[in-house]
Amino acid sequence: MDFGLQPPEITSGEMYLGPGAGPMLAAAVAWDGLAAELQSMAASYASIVEGMASESWLGPSSAGMAAAAAPYVTWMSGTSAQAKAAADQARAAVVAYETAFAAVVPPPQIAANRSQLISLVATNIFGQNTAAIAATEAEYGEMWAQDTMAMFGYASSSATASRLTPFTAPPQTTNPSGLAGQAAATGQATALASGTNAVTTALSSAAAQFPFDIIPTLLQGLATLSTQYTQLMGQLINAIFGPTGATTYQNVFVTAANVTKFSTWANDAMSAPNLGMTEFKVFWQPPPAPEIPKSSLGAGLGLRSGLSAGLAHAASAGLGQANLVGDLSVPPSWASATPAVRLVANTLPATSLAAAPATQIPANLLGQMALGSMTGGALGAAAPAIYTGSGARARANGGTPSAEPVKLEAVIAQLQKQPDAVRHWNVDKADLDGLLDRLSKQPGIHAVHVSNGDKPKVALPDTQLGSH
């Protein structure tokens, strides 16, 4: 628009008669509010999507949801920034308008100039107002130029302020083919409903054609057949067993059927004795068992009565049979040359150990747990044989036992007759096993003297005797 062709009265009049900067200020406030709302929605939307995708909802569906929602969050953030820019441009337009409004000549001033010109022209009879008229016209020209410059500046500023970035539509966050799929599913459901209705109609038609009135007739016929069968069987039994055969058969059958009902009154009759037996098992406490003498616990061990309280002789001799100690065969005639000589062999102490102290029988003797705890008890059991040797001495028990044990004094007497046949060895207890291993590979009769520390100490013949 060429503002130079428009007189200042019109230009200034339009600026003063227009709505002013109020609408632009309202637009700026509205754009600011829209920008803030979009920014808040974008932040809230992003927070909700992130919380669901990282905490409460995991998996491929969650990832797909987050991927679909991310473009919408980006769009809201971008649109919020554009709205903020529009608000700033609206405020810039307000500034441009106020600048142009202040720059244009006020309409009353232009009207006064025009009134003065008319008055000067009317009174210029002799040309005396020519200079005043020229000055008034010059002033008017300046007003024209001033309005023209103000409007050109305003047009340029308002054009820049009103140049906005075009807004874009929100992205599509759903599957475009979803509506088509929904329509197809709806069509299938409708077709299925139609098929179901058709099947229901067909079944109803078939049911209407079925002759349900024959069912009572069939039931009545079955009842008549059952009655006739019962009468026929009664007549047959009476014909075979006499006039009262059917009645007797019925009584026997009823009695047999009622046998199973006897358990009810039998249980009622036995409830009182059962109650007494239960109380007896719970509260009856038998007297404690008498203490078993320890001397009788050694019976059956095959030991002499004089050795029942101590260590029994582990070595014994057999008649007509050599004893085995490891790999050595010991002749039946052996003896101890002197009391200081100790014949070392595998020590097999078998002691009559003291019996376990008699325990009190539990109060509830008839309880299953009490009976189970007595299983495997040691009361009256024979003491187990204790094998203290190792190496060659532990193999002394592997020989064939003697057919009949003999007294140890007889064996010692036989050994005393051949004292030179015995080879004597002195050894400490620590080297005893090694010596016995070496002697097991040498033939002959060996007597090993075991010493305790610096002072040799030979055991008596009746404590631990053996051959090697």
Curated annotation (Swiss-Prot):
Q: What happens when the gene is disrupted?
A: Cell envelope-associated glycolipid phthiocerol dimycocerosate (PDIM)-positive mutants with simultaneous deletion of PPE31/PPE32/PPE33 genes have a growth defect in Mg(2+) restricted media, particularly at mildly acidic pH, but the PDIM-negative mutants grow normally.
Disordered as annotated region, ranges: 447-468
- Sorted alphabetically, which InterPro entries does this protein's record hold? PPE_C, PPE_dom, PPE_sf
One GO BP: response to host immune response
Pfam families noted in UniProt:
PPE, PPE-SVP
Q: Which family does it belong to?
A: Belongs to the mycobacterial PPE family.
Q: What is this protein called?
A: Uncharacterized PPE family protein PPE33
Organism for this UniProt entry: Mycobacterium tuberculosis (strain ATCC 25618 / H37Rv)
